[in-house]
Structure formats: structure tokens, C-alpha cells
Amino acid sequence: LYVNSGSSALYIGMEASNFPEGGEVITPALTFSTTIGCIVKSKLIPVFIDVGFNDYCIDVQAIEKNITSRTVAIVAPNLMGNICNWEKISEIAKKHNLKVIEDSADTIGGTLNGKLSGSYCDWTITSFYGSHIINCAGNGGMLCMNDEKMINDAKLLRSWGRSSSIFDAKSEAIENR
């Protein structure tokens, strides 16, 4: 789903996830402000953990000891071209029935053990801002998921609740322009 920025992709994805108010979201302390902003705006509680000294990615050894009965998700960015240990994060999330959200703004097209960035998570975002791998002369972002209901909810959020126009249902969708 194309949106105006990677930040908007995070906000829309978090809103479309319908997490229960007061749920906890594990995230690294070293991240862009949007990661925290979308958690707080969705009335969730960020649980900060440290990052690895050499890769600046979420410290997978610290995740499990920070999981509580209120934890609903893990949100982690790949940072400065370094990809998180998504295999371990995914394994922990499955064990505890948590959603995994990847911010791949810095690593679109990157691979981990032959699998593309974004393959281990429930949904991912990327940004096309000028400082990222692929840019589009200013801004732009994308939300990627494999959940039809959630993508339909996200489309409604992107279009301020409109699902059709005076012409037809497809006339307002940016993908059809």
C-alpha cells in the first residue's frame, strides 16, 4: 500500500493492526522517533531494549526477558544497512504469539540467509525519503503485508474512510492512476 511517507506507513499499519489499548510493544531504544510515535498514538506502551554494539539492531537476547502477558508485538528497524536477526525474532514471536513488525527503510532489497528483508514479519514498511536506499524526489512510503482484511482497513485509513467515489470504487486508489 503506497502512502506519503514511511512514517505514515508505520502509523497506518499500527492502527490497522487493532492491538488492544495498553498492550506492550517491544522496540529498541535506538530508533527514529516515528517508531515510538506510532506506538504511543495507538495507545500502546513501548518497552525499550538495547541494541547490539556492532550492528545497532535490536538485541535479540534481551527480547524474551522483556515479554509480559500484555506484550502484543515486536517492532524493530533494520538500521544503517544492518538486518536484524529476524529468524530469532520470528521464533520468539511465534513462541509467545506476538506480531512482528519490520521497519526496512534502510534495507529494502536486503537478504538474510537468502530470504528477502520482510519475509519473517507480519508486516513491514519502507520509506522512499531521500536518505534511504530508494527515494522518490522527496518522500513516499509503502506498507507491505499479506492480510487482506488488514490491507483493506489500511486503505480506508489512508483515504480518510472513503472506499468509493462518485465514479467507482477504483477511481480514488493511487494504485490505479
Locate each region found by the language model.
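Phosphate-binding glycine-rich loop
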Residues: 1-24, 38-41, 48-50, 115
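Hydrophobic residues in well-ordered beta-strands that form the structural core
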Residues: 21, 27, 48, 100-102, ...
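Proline-centered loop/turn at the N-terminus of a beta-strand
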Residues: 24, 45, 72-73, 97-99, ...
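Aromatic/hydrophobic pocket-lining residues that form π-stacking "cages" and hydrophobic walls in ligand
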Residues: 35, 89, 154
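Hydrophobic/aromatic ligand-binding patch that stacks against planar heteroaromatic rings
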Residues: 37-39, 92, 133
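Catalytic PLP-binding core of fold-type I/II PLP enzymes
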Residues: 60-75, 80-114, 147
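Active-site region of PLP-dependent enzymes
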Residues: 107-113, 120-177
